[in-house]
């Protein structure tokens, strides 16, 4: 597959420019690699190829994307359907892309997640567990839940802020040095009708699984969503998907904010990093070269460390998240699963999760 070059000067002067591109003027979702600046081809690699893996009659590919070494699979959360049908975990084999579904005990409405080293785990090995943001429902608190997919066991790590009920925990990352869990709390369970009305602000938190300390590290969001550390761990990126609540409102945030990480514990110097031109930036990951990738309204957008849009993995529909694997990135757009292969870029956590590419 060749890259499609976007003429930024033509786009600057003609708001209908995209309608002239065959790659974007489509009636059904299809994948293309849109290069906004020549650097994008170097990020993905000149030999990168893209294709659709599968198209299912239900929204199996929504959030998460956590690697489990024992079965060489990614664990992806499905989209919410009803209170009678808990959110499923979709298991994608990286051997042949076969798809299965499972559920874990005491995990009710899973959303974002990450690989997890519990206290005392051997960090010279790949992470033995996964941790999910459980949005909860009317009968269960929203929680951070640790899961061992190999033994089908789970443990609630945190289900309140010092006794106050969270709204709908959305996404989480583990700091690779301290082991702390950094996570966001949004209102989407309430907007989707399976959580009570929120009772506290929408914020970013830091939790120490070793001590039980939980701390608010950032507020002032409409809907804090995805979060990710830069490769050097000096910056935390947080997406605000406030443009989407009961419906889409383009005058509200569809924004990525950047913060300085201070002493691995707190945040400072909040600033606007990027704004999504289509939809809103949801799940977010960094690569080892400092580029910032986010799922958005028409696929995955890629910015350099200065916030310049380099290009898009365009699929023509909303993507909520994606996952890096060695030499590839899998893109989740609810009922459809896409892949870019022969990928040059390496995700920040690929070395930790897969034990591959650690020499970079």
Q: How would you name each of these model-derived features?
A:
Residues 94-95, 206-210, 301-314, 321-329, ...:
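Flexible "stalk/tail and boundary" regions
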Residues 56-71, 106-135, 161-181, 188-189, ...:
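Beta-rich, blade/repeat-based domains predominating
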Residues 92, 150, 258-266, 342-349:
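Short loop/turn segments immediately following beta-strands, especially the blade-tip
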Residues 87-90, 142-145, 202-205, 255-257, ...:
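A short loop-to-beta-strand structural motif that recurs across blades of beta-propeller domains
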Residues 16, 27-54, 100-109, 154-167, ...:
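Surface-exposed loop and turn segments in beta-propeller and other repeat-based domains
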């Amino acid at each position: 597959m060749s890259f499609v070059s976007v003429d930024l000067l033509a786009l600057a002067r003609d708001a209908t420019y995209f309608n002239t591109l065959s790659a974007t003027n489509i009636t059904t979702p299809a994948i293309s690699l849109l290069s906004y600046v020549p650097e994008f081809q170097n990020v993905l690699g000149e030999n990168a190829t893209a294709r659709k893996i599968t198209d299912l009659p239900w929204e199996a590919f929504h959030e998460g994307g956590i690697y489990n070494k024992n079965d060489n699979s990614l664990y992806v959360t499905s989209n919410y359907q009803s209170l009678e049908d808990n959110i499923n975990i979709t298991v994608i084999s990286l051997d042949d892309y076969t798809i299965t579904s499972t559920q874990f005990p005491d995990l009710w409405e899973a959303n974002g997640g990450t690989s997890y080293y519990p206290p005392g785990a051997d960090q010279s090995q790949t992470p033995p567990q996964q941790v999910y943001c459980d949005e909860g429902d009317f009968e269960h608190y929203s929680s951070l839940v640790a899961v061992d997919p190999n033994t089908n066991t789970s443990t609630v790590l945190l289900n309140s802020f010092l006794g106050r009920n969270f709204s709908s925990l959305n996404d989480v990352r583990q700091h690779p040095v301290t082991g702390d869990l950094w996570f966001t709390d949004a209102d989407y369970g309430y907007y989707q009708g399976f959580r009570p009305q929120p009772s506290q602000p929408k914020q970013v938190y830091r939790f120490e699984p070793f001590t039980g300390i939980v701390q608010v590290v950032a507020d002032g969001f409409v809907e804090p969503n995805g979060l990710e550390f830069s490769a050097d761990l000096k910056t935390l990126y947080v997406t605000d998907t406030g443009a989407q609540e009961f419906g889409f409102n383009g005058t509200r945030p569809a924004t990525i904010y950047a913060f300085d990480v201070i002493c691995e514990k707190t945040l400072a110097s909040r600033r606007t990093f990027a704004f999504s031109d289509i939809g809103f930036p949801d799940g977010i990951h960094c690569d080892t070269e400092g580029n910032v990738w986010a799922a958005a309204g028409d696929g995955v957008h890629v910015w350099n460390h200065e916030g310049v849009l380099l290009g898009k993995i365009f699929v023509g529909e909303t993507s909520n998240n994606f996952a890096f694997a060695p030499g590839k990135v899998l893109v989740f757009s609810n009922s459809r699963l896409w892949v870019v292969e022969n990928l040059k870029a390496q995700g920040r956590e690929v070395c930790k999760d897969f034990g591959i590419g650690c020499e970079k």
